[in-house]
Amino acid sequence: MIISSASDYRAAAKRKLPRFLFDYIDGGAYAEHTLRANGSDLADISLRQRVLKNVDNVSLETRLFGESLAMPIILSPVGLSGMYARRGEVQVARAAANKRIPFCLSTVSVCSIEEVASQSDQAIWFQLYVLKDRGFMKNALERAKAAGVTTLVFTVDMPTPGARYRDAHSGMSGPYAAPRRILQAMTKPDWALNVGLLGRPHDLGNISRYLGKATTLEDYVGWLANNFDPSISWKDLEWIREFWQGPMIIKGILDPQDARDALSFGADGIVVSNHGGRQLDGVLSTAKALPPIVQAVGSDLTVLADSGIRSGLDVVRMLALGAKGVLLGRSMAYALGADGQRGVENMLDIFAREMHVAMTLTGVTSIEQIDASILVKAVA
């Protein structure tokens, strides 16, 4: 199969992965309106092409949270990445290190913090959920510190899991889910051998010690569902800010007031995100939510964004809307599922080339020069 764009990896992953895994990453909440809007609203933003601007030296280099990056991209925390390729989180961490960008490990990763950190040539970031079990959270933070994690990404948009109907149809959840997953795996022999068999263990490395002999996917999902904490407030997070001395990013912000609250709380950054359309269907797309949030916090808070970013052009659009960097989730997972570490690295190369072209043709040569002036709407 010819891979010329990041979207090609979606088709390749669909061919290679069992349905329950592909639909888990590909799907969204309810009728998936927000999932689709994330992409379409970005695509509707027109770039302002310029000519004769001397764009001989275009650089994607930038700095975020004290780190020098090859481009303003972070590989997102994606749960169960170790099911998309053998020890998938390790492969993603290596790809990120080779491309000199950060990788953020999910709480619900197959590979543990310690395994991924020991296999990566650069320090990783770590994502943590708000959970009722404060002992687990404190232990996870201590483990992250010990493993050399530099940056904490705190996800706050999951006081309860979203309703993802596609998962019930695919076998990720619902009646007879386990036998359905087995039957699907049998139709994908390459995945069944390389990941299903040789990629063991398939437990969630950061959680398994809390579950004892309960090791099925349903056990993990049940533990998480029972531990999401709808009573949490900003005050409940003060101990985390005191405990974690490194950069702390709040992920899941869609409202300007919540962005202001994150600033008052002492966060170093936020991620404007609707969880890829996987939580509440009908909320604003990230592209529409981002500008008023940037206006609300100005330069006092580093604003990142995710959801709907499928190309280097989309990265440039998000930067023009005010983000300082973006997180890639689905694009990373598709590439990982299709071709492991090599796929992720090639996907990042594609994004970099697309960014380079977009910057060249809009007349900017550095990330710092990208702003609303390169958008047609800004000059209409």
Swiss-Prot record:
<keyword id="KW-0285">Flavoprotein</keyword>
<feature type="binding site">
    <location>
        <position position="127"/>
    </location>
    <ligand>
        <name>FMN</name>
    </ligand>
</feature>
<feature type="binding site">
    <location>
        <position position="164"/>
    </location>
    <ligand>
        <name>substrate</name>
    </ligand>
</feature>
<dbReference type="InterPro" id="IPR037396">
    <property type="entry name" value="FMN_HAD"/>
</dbReference>
<feature type="binding site">
    <location>
        <position position="106"/>
    </location>
    <ligand>
        <name>FMN</name>
    </ligand>
</feature>
<dbReference type="GO" id="GO:0010181">
    <property type="term" value="F:FMN binding"/>
</dbReference>
<feature type="active site" description="Proton acceptor">
    <location>
        <position position="275"/>
    </location>
</feature>
<feature type="binding site">
    <location>
        <position position="155"/>
    </location>
    <ligand>
        <name>FMN</name>
    </ligand>
</feature>
<keyword id="KW-1003">Cell membrane</keyword>
<dbReference type="InterPro" id="IPR020920">
    <property type="entry name" value="LldD"/>
</dbReference>
<keyword id="KW-0288">FMN</keyword>
<feature type="domain" description="FMN hydroxy acid dehydrogenase">
    <location>
        <begin position="1"/>
        <end position="380"/>
    </location>
</feature>
<dbReference type="GO" id="GO:0004459">
    <property type="term" value="F:L-lactate dehydrogenase activity"/>
</dbReference>
<dbReference type="InterPro" id="IPR008259">
    <property type="entry name" value="FMN_hydac_DH_AS"/>
</dbReference>
<keyword id="KW-0472">Membrane</keyword>
<dbReference type="GO" id="GO:0009060">
    <property type="term" value="P:aerobic respiration"/>
</dbReference>
<dbReference type="GO" id="GO:0006089">
    <property type="term" value="P:lactate metabolic process"/>
</dbReference>
<comment type="subunit">
    <text>Homotetramer.</text>
</comment>
<dbReference type="InterPro" id="IPR012133">
    <property type="entry name" value="Alpha-hydoxy_acid_DH_FMN"/>
</dbReference>
<feature type="binding site">
    <location>
        <position position="278"/>
    </location>
    <ligand>
        <name>substrate</name>
    </ligand>
</feature>
<keyword id="KW-0997">Cell inner membrane</keyword>
<dbReference type="Pfam" id="PF01070">
    <property type="entry name" value="FMN_dh"/>
</dbReference>
<keyword id="KW-0560">Oxidoreductase</keyword>
<protein>
    <recommendedName>
        <fullName>L-lactate dehydrogenase</fullName>
        <ecNumber>1.1.-.-</ecNumber>
    </recommendedName>
</protein>
<feature type="binding site">
    <location>
        <begin position="306"/>
        <end position="330"/>
    </location>
    <ligand>
        <name>FMN</name>
    </ligand>
</feature>
<comment type="similarity">
    <text>Belongs to the FMN-dependent alpha-hydroxy acid dehydrogenase family.</text>
</comment>
<comment type="function">
    <text>Catalyzes the conversion of L-lactate to pyruvate. Is coupled to the respiratory chain.</text>
</comment>
<feature type="binding site">
    <location>
        <position position="251"/>
    </location>
    <ligand>
        <name>FMN</name>
    </ligand>
</feature>
<feature type="binding site">
    <location>
        <position position="129"/>
    </location>
    <ligand>
        <name>substrate</name>
    </ligand>
</feature>
<dbReference type="InterPro" id="IPR000262">
    <property type="entry name" value="FMN-dep_DH"/>
</dbReference>
<dbReference type="GO" id="GO:0005886">
    <property type="term" value="C:plasma membrane"/>
</dbReference>
<feature type="binding site">
    <location>
        <position position="24"/>
    </location>
    <ligand>
        <name>substrate</name>
    </ligand>
</feature>
<dbReference type="InterPro" id="IPR013785">
    <property type="entry name" value="Aldolase_TIM"/>
</dbReference>
